[in-house]
């Protein structure tokens, strides 16, 4: 049962002052309690965030908040194709190496993001028209990037945003040239590159159990798994509008029915960042056994891609919002 807002606020105040006494100065931590630690106490793997060299070296409060309050990191941009292989066969890992070193040094679980995506894709890839060429390019890219961090990345978003809103495959260079077989190629290559990593298919607008897009995801994943494609998890980005948190339970349960080992909330942000919405999403993951964790897509509002909607858990002064304390109280 989800506590009402009055209960959440009261409990949050009690825990805030208790946390100050037990966890050191709030100023150094930026929040009195780690929601990651409390989430893990319920048997989940992580409650995490994102980072890259630019944000880590910007406001010093960002790394302080990550170190103290979150247990997992995804790279916002540094592992995308345009960053790692801007020219064919010429790999650049400066940004992603920095990210991985920070995460490992601070004991954070790493999710790799992302290997095959139609966006932030160099033109030399998007202009390919030959099946053999594109297959070889995909295999080389996936293998090289994954082996760079073999044994260091818990899970990879192997393919990202491959569905249209009607549940059909998105038109992209990958689907145009290879059809849906690009999914098999990507996952089989990823499994070979790092057999221990969990392999995810990730998408947005999977926020209603009855939507055509979610149903398309489920039916395709069931089919691919039955055909032997090694898909371990489904990632729901969960970029929500205000008031949409209540649907998270139904959507995660529906995604879990596809037959993967895991599901995860991979890019969470919510317009207005209400306590109710955030607690609804946290409870949805707690209640679904296959949901291993939640990644919030940004630390503080100024760094959000949706900054004008104030969607994150820390405000413009990098102080925790009511939603952060409500999550801590609910846990």
Swiss-Prot record:
GO MF terms, alphabetically ordered: endo-1,4-beta-xylanase activity
Enzyme active site: 161, 267
Cross-referenced Gene3D superfamilies: Glycosidases (3.20.20.80)
A single Gene Ontology CC term: extracellular region
Catalytic activity: Endohydrolysis of (1->4)-beta-D-xylosidic linkages in xylans
Keywords, in A-Z order: Carbohydrate metabolism, Disulfide bond, Glycosidase, Hydrolase, Polysaccharide degradation, Secreted, Signal, Xylan degradation
Temperature dependence (free text): Optimum temperature is 40 degrees Celsius.
InterPro entries: GH10 (IPR044846), GH10_AS (IPR031158), GH10_dom (IPR001000), Glycoside_hydrolase_SF (IPR017853)
Signal sequence region: 1-23
Subcellular location(s) per record: Secreted
Enzyme class of the recorded protein, top EC level: hydrolase
Domain spans labelled GH10: 50-330
Single biological process term from Gene Ontology: xylan catabolic process
Domain of life: Eukaryota
EC number: 3.2.1.8
Pathway this chain belongs to: Glycan degradation; xylan degradation
UniProt record similarity statement: Belongs to the glycosyl hydrolase 10 (cellulase F) family.
Job of this protein: Endo-1,4-beta-xylanase involved in the hydrolysis of xylan, a major structural heterogeneous polysaccharide found in plant biomass representing the second most abundant polysaccharide in the biosphere, after cellulose.
Protein name from the UniProt record: Endo-1,4-beta-xylanase 1
């Amino acid at each position: 049962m989800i506590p009402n807002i009055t209960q959440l606020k009261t409990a949050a105040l009690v825990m805030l002052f208790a946390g100050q006494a037990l966890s050191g100065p709030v100023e150094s931590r930026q929040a009195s309690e780690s929601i990651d630690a409390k989430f893990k106490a319920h048997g989940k793997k992580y409650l995490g965030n994102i980072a890259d060299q630019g944000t880590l070296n910007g406001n010093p409060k960002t790394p302080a908040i990550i170190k103290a309050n979150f247990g997992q990191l995804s790279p916002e941009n540094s592992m995308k194709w345009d960053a790692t292989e801007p020219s064919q066969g010429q790999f650049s890992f400066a940004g992603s190496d920095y990210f991985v070193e920070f995460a490992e040094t601070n004991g954070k679980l790493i999710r790799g993001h992302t290997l095959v995506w139609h966006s932030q894709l160099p033109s030399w890839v998007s202009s390919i028209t030959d099946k053999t060429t594109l297959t070889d390019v995909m295999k080389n890219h996936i293998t090289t990037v994954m082996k760079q961090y073999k044994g260091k990345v818990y899970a990879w978003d192997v393919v990202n945003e491959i569905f249209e809103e009607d549940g059909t495959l998105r038109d992209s260079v990958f689907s145009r040239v290879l059809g849906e077989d690009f999914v098999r190629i990507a996952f089989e290559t990823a499994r070979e590159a790092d057999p221990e990593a969990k392999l995810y298919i990730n998408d947005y607008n999977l926020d209603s159990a009855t939507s055509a897009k979610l149903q398309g995801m489920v039916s395709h994943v069931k089919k691919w798994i039955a055909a032997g494609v090694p898909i371990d998890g489904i990632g729901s980005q969960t970029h929500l509008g205000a008031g949409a948190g209540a649907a998270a339970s139904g959507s995660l349960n529906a995604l879990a029915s596809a037959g993967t080992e895991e599901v995860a909330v991979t890019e969470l942000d919510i317009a207005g960042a209400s306590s109710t919405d955030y607690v609804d999403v946290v409870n949805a993951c707690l209640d679904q056994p296959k949901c291993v964790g939640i990644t919030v897509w940004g630390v503080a509002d100024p760094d959000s891609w949706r900054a004008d909607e104030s969607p994150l858990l820390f405000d413009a002064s990098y102080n925790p919002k009511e939603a952060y304390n409500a999550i801590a109280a609910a846990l």
